[in-house]
A protein has these predicted regions:
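N-terminal subdomain of nucleotide-sugar transferases
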Residues: 1-67, 190
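Aromatic "clamp/platform" in nucleotide-sugar-dependent glycosyltransferases that forms part
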Residues: 318
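Donor nucleotide-sugar binding/catalytic pocket of nucleotide-sugar-dependent glycosyltransferases
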Residues: 70, 170-225, 231
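Short alpha-helical donor nucleotide-sugar binding micro-motif in glycosyltransferases
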Residues: 297-298, 305-310
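Nucleotide-activated donor-binding/catalytic signature segment of Leloir-type glycosyltransferases, i.e.
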Residues: 278-298
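Short hydrophobic beta-strand element within catalytic cores of glycosyltransferases
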Residues: 335-338
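A conserved mid-protein helix/loop that constitutes part of the nucleotide-sugar donor-binding site
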Residues: 28, 234, 241-260, 274-280
Length: 425
């Protein structure tokens, strides 16, 4: 890439302060990637009007990184759809995308662009309505959507949650069969995918598919070294929502097994969510309630401190597409034990943690306990894997490194070349 191209970016979620955003994980992805893109391209950003307070004044020509921000909104009467975190949010985004497509078509009649990139709220089954209308190369993603709860582990969910998962899969398959989705995939010059399940769903377009994480980390958040600040005992940490898909019943059963050889082990659960009463009841039945530390959701800096003081990060999520907290644990020199599914399975590689294959719940719980037991028996393993995890976060997940990779993907798209495939982490 020689001259700065002009890029039209759609990032529905895009905000520099995730705590003030409606969708924190998506918002920081949108903000961070757009921030990196402005280093080598002139950007016109289309985003949701909700982000205006956080974005105004952030991209200015005085910084030498020009960006024009265009806000698109829907009528206030439709905002109530956002209260339903499952279907309402996607329905609202579908309508927003149609509105954004009309705006983009009008903008393209008076402005000239070299490339279009759709970043946030991207998944393999929801098509881009903007891309097919623009006569320029299209970069799609990073996208997820292919991940789903492994069949045998669905039994760990309550009945209502199993019904919801079946409805989710049905809805996705209907969308995948639409002409609009096929048009978007055909139009794309590069499709960035954030987990292996989504890559498999897109096998028909594998020549366009590039592994690219949906999570990153700022340089300031990467620990200077990976040496743990141990406080004694054997401390496990989980941070995130207490939601059905997080697999926490497996974590509690693994703790029960682990305590047969490590009776002093503790598991700190940082977060909140609707599953807590069910988890408390399960912990009492399993006899592990006295080994749990329940901590309300904490500021990011406090969670990072806890990561530095823990031995292992336990994250048995059943179908997370990304898993930003896994990257944050790695950046703080904390090895990860997770299932080999979705985003966590994408992030953790040999040497930076231990992944357990999905299967029957009792077998998976035993596998998690066995992985944790390895760290209990060999403190040096925690140090070695912690260093590898921290180094991997710095070399692959730092936002500036992801920006460099994105620049190469743009180069290929603008030159009409297939994207260069790189090693998945």
């Amino acid at each position: 890439m020689t001259a700065r191209p002009r890029v039209l970016v759609s990032a529905y979620a895009c905000h520099p302060r995730p705590e003030a955003a409606h969708f924190p994980g998506e918002a920081i992805l949108g903000w961070s990637l757009v921030d990196e893109i402005t280093r080598f391209a002139d950007v016109d950003l289309i985003t949701w009007a909700f982000n205006r307070p956080g974005l105004e004044g952030t991209f200015t020509k005085s910084e030498g990184r020009p960006a024009a921000v265009h806000y698109v909104d829907l009528p206030p009467r439709l905002h109530r759809a956002l209260r339903d975190r499952h279907y309402g949010v996607r329905f609202y985004y579908f309508l927003w995308q149609r509105q954004a497509a009309r705006f983009a078509k009008g903008l393209a009649r008076s402005e000239s662009f070299d490339l279009f990139h759709q970043i946030t709220f991207s998944n393999d089954w929801m098509p881009s309505f903007i891309a097919p209308a623009l006569p320029v190369p299209f970069v799609w993603g990073p996208i997820g959507g292919g991940q789903k709860v492994p069949g045998e582990l669905a039994s760990t969910l309550a009945r209502r949650d199993r019904r919801r998962e079946r409805s989710r899969t049905l809805l996705q398959n209907v969308w995948r069969a639409t002409p609009a989705r096929r048009r978007a995939a055909r139009k794309a010059s590069a499709i960035l995918v954030c987990n292996k399940e989504t890559e498999e769903v897109l096998a028909r377009w594998r020549d366009k598919v590039v592994a690219f994480p949906v999570n990153g980390i700022g340089r300031e958040a990467i620990a200077a070294d990976a040496a743990p600040e141990r406080r004694g005992g054997f401390r496990l940490l989980y941070a995130g929502r207490f939601d059905p898909i997080k697999g926490l019943p497996l974590a509690l059963d693994a703790l029960r097994i682990l305590r047969t050889i490590a009776p002093a082990v503790t598991l700190e659960l940082v977060g909140e969510g609707p599953e807590r009463p069910r988890l408390e009841a399960l912990a009492a039945r399993l006899g592990v309630a006295d080994g749990l530390i329940w901590t309300p959701w904490s500021p990011r800096s406090e969670i990072f401190k806890k990561m530095r003081q823990s031995d292992v990060f336990l994250f048995p999520s059943l179908r997370d597409g990304g898993g930003a907290v896994v990257v944050e644990a790695m950046a703080n020199g904390l090895p990860v034990v997770c299932l080999d599914v979705g985003g966590p399975g994408f992030h953790v590689r040999e040497g930076s943690g231990i992944k357990v294959r999905p299967g029957r719940p009792d077998v998976v719980a035993a596998g998690l306990a066995g992985a944790l037991g390895r760290f209990w028996c060999d403190p040096g393993l925690r140090d070695r894997m912690g260093r590898e995890a921290r180094d991997r976060a710095a070399s692959y997940y730092a936002w500036d490194r992801l920006g460099e990779r994105l620049r190469g993907i743009y180069d290929d798209a603008l030159a009409g070349r297939p994207p260069r495939r790189e090693e998945r982490p």
